[in-house]
Amino acid sequence: MNKRLLRSLLSLMVCMAMLLSLTPAVLAESADAPSTEMAVGAVIHGFEVVENGEFALLNAKTTVLRHQKTGATVFFLINEDTNRAFDISFVTPLSDDKGIPHVFEHSTLDGSKKYPSASLFFNLIYQTYNTYMNAATYQVMTTYPVASLSEAQLRKYADFYLDSCFNPMIYEDESLFRSEAWRYSLESADSPLTISGTVYSEMQGAASLETSASYNAMKAAFPGSHMGYNQGGEPTEIPSMTWQEVKDYHTAYYHPSNSLTTVYGAIDDPAAFLALLDEAFSPYEAKAFDFSTPDYTPVTSPVEKVCQYPVYEGTETENAAVTYITFICENATEEEQNVLDLLTMLLSDSSSALVSNLVDVLPNADISVYLETDGPEPAVVFVATGMNEGDVQTLRECIYASVLEFAENGVSQDILDAIASSLTMETALMSEESDLGVNMAQNIAYCWATTGDVHAYEKTIANMDNFEKYQTEGKYAEVAKKYLTEDNQRVITVTTVPAPGQQEAIEADLAAKLAETKAAMSAEEIDQLVADTAAL
């Protein structure tokens, strides 16, 4: 998984067990064990119980079930949290920057066969007892979480989500695609032609040098793989998307065999949820999914490149670049990846030698480090902001020297204690949040999407207990020397710099193309587009 994405919540969970003992009513000491009907081997509404267990940090009893017909996985986490949550997630890989999974995520909740109303989703959000209702597209998955203080309401919302995911209205209604993705707009016959669309506009607003730098770095580190594509969609690419592509994408990936359903909280009648799921899944046959990356071409020698990000003339460019230095950790074992994950947290700590040394040589720069495991190979990624293009060699030398210093001296007990204290404080703040079930469901789904293991998130949390163990055993120094020194030739350095004046050029080019498109329209086409624009 992308550890930078999940780290904040993972860190919050380290001291969860201690906090749960302080949390009244909502999370009591322990949930009742699943009923005998959830015994391993039992079949309930077409689902076979595969295993029962515990998620100690949530005081939850867990049950994993497999749908006999499709192989779909369902994960129950039953405790006494009355803010119950339901989530269904799908692995949705990327092959371009059009943002197809993002558009489908939006259109999914625009109505379905059973619930044919484009406005129903927004009405449901404001219902009594509902505490959360949304959908989100990530680099590797699309997820549909909902939460409620009423179990009966949660089942109704689950039914709405299931029908929306599997029987969306977008198959029959192209206007939903035009509304959510992109469309030509014309206010009047004399107005300039423009492009509109919910996702198109959203991604224009979301564009930034920092996010572009991340995509640039991952494309260079993992060429030919799904890494580095913008899951939300690049505004320059979204208008090349077609309605048929969105429908084909749904057909390819929105299948029970490619799903994980998580049900969390004080669930009195799990069988009722299984009945809903069986009804939604049964029209499908089991299907095998292959998410390998046959076009991936591994980098075998050092790579360095500079990418430009368009900004307006006059934009401040001093200390505005972002540099990614990615170390491919070839054939790193699962244990080595666990060590690297915690090592990156130690290197990122404000008291670390890396941070201290960087202040001395590049006082305007900030650095963070994370373990990337979403790609075809694990990698440790150093991200420096507040950079200039000419600072790259200084940054690289600082990283190498600091890693060697760390390998020689290890980490002080003071830093270990400081990290533990910080995690305790963050966990205390988390206890005040209301969406624990939703957050847990999404993180479980994300880890499952990248590993195929429904317990991967639990294992990542458990690894947090190994901070001092790895130090005592010399594991940090071992992996640091093996993967993060100049001996590793598989290092990719990508700096993204602002390019003043390019944004004006892009906008002028788009305006010229739109003017050309309008000039080619007939009078009847223009009148129809004006009417369509008014209707939308």
PLM features: residue spans?
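Helicase-associated low-complexity regulatory tails and linkers flanking the ATPase motor
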Residues: 3, 60-63, 292-294
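Bacterial N-terminal signal peptides
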Residues: 11-21
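Sec-dependent signal peptide cleavage junction
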Residues: 19-33
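Charge-rich, well-structured scaffold segments of protease-associated domains
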Residues: 34-42, 107, 111-298, 319-323, ...
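Short acidic-hydrophobic surface loop/beta-edge motif
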Residues: 61-69, 303-314
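Active/ligand-binding-proximal structured segments within catalytic/core domains
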Residues: 78-120, 124, 334-347
